[in-house]
Swiss-Prot record:
<feature type="disulfide bond">
    <location>
        <begin position="64"/>
        <end position="90"/>
    </location>
</feature>
<keyword id="KW-0325">Glycoprotein</keyword>
<dbReference type="GO" id="GO:0005144">
    <property type="term" value="F:interleukin-13 receptor binding"/>
</dbReference>
<dbReference type="GO" id="GO:0006955">
    <property type="term" value="P:immune response"/>
</dbReference>
<dbReference type="InterPro" id="IPR009079">
    <property type="entry name" value="4_helix_cytokine-like_core"/>
</dbReference>
<feature type="glycosylation site" description="N-linked (GlcNAc...) asparagine">
    <location>
        <position position="72"/>
    </location>
</feature>
<keyword id="KW-1015">Disulfide bond</keyword>
<feature type="glycosylation site" description="N-linked (GlcNAc...) asparagine">
    <location>
        <position position="49"/>
    </location>
</feature>
<comment type="function">
    <text>Cytokine that plays important roles in allergic inflammation and immune response to parasite infection. Synergizes with IL2 in regulating interferon-gamma synthesis. Stimulates B-cell proliferation, and activation of eosinophils, basophils, and mast cells. Plays an important role in controlling IL33 activity by modulating the production of transmembrane and soluble forms of interleukin-1 receptor-like 1/IL1RL1.</text>
</comment>
<dbReference type="GO" id="GO:0005615">
    <property type="term" value="C:extracellular space"/>
</dbReference>
<dbReference type="InterPro" id="IPR020470">
    <property type="entry name" value="IL-13"/>
</dbReference>
<keyword id="KW-0964">Secreted</keyword>
<dbReference type="GO" id="GO:0006954">
    <property type="term" value="P:inflammatory response"/>
</dbReference>
<keyword id="KW-0732">Signal</keyword>
<feature type="disulfide bond">
    <location>
        <begin position="48"/>
        <end position="76"/>
    </location>
</feature>
<dbReference type="GO" id="GO:0002639">
    <property type="term" value="P:positive regulation of immunoglobulin production"/>
</dbReference>
<dbReference type="Pfam" id="PF03487">
    <property type="entry name" value="IL13"/>
</dbReference>
Length: 132
């Protein structure tokens, strides 16, 4: 019985070494890009019923700004995973109705165009090795 208990304790301790650690930023960005590719390729009907979002400045704080725009789209299951993934990149909590200075407040675009623009920008960041 003592041997069995010792074995269980040893396996439990060693299990911690095999447990997954944090996802590297390059992997997380690649997964986000893959998700955006899936969204743009599988588009049969207007994405999110043609909902409009604020255009964003893609040169700084792109993840939080993108999340702030997309968080205001409700009832669109196609972008829910993207919203969750973007929240992993954003260091602060983003809630609906929140606006940052990174929005171009005079310009609204369709979610589909927003996703395409974001995808192109994230691919560029990935090629340049800028993961954060």
């Amino acid at each position: 019985m003592a041997l069995l208990l010792t074995t269980v304790i040893a396996l439990t301790c060693l299990g911690g070494f095999a447990s997954p650690g944090p996802v590297p930023p390059s992997t997380a960005l690649r997964e986000l890009i893959e998700e955006l590719v899936n969204i743009t390729q599988n588009q049969k009907a207007p994405l999110c019923n043609g909902s409009m979002v604020w255009s964003i400045n893609l040169t700084a704080g792109v993840y939080c700004a993108a999340l702030e725009s997309l968080i205001n789209v409700s009832g669109c299951s196609a972008i829910e995973k993207t919203q969750r993934m973007l929240s992993g990149f954003c260091p602060h909590k983003v809630s609906a109705g929140q606006f940052s200075s990174l929005h171009v407040r005079d310009t609204k675009i369709e979610v589909a165009q927003f996703v395409k623009d974001l995808l192109l920008h994230l691919k560029k960041l990935f090629r340049e090795g800028r993961f954060n």
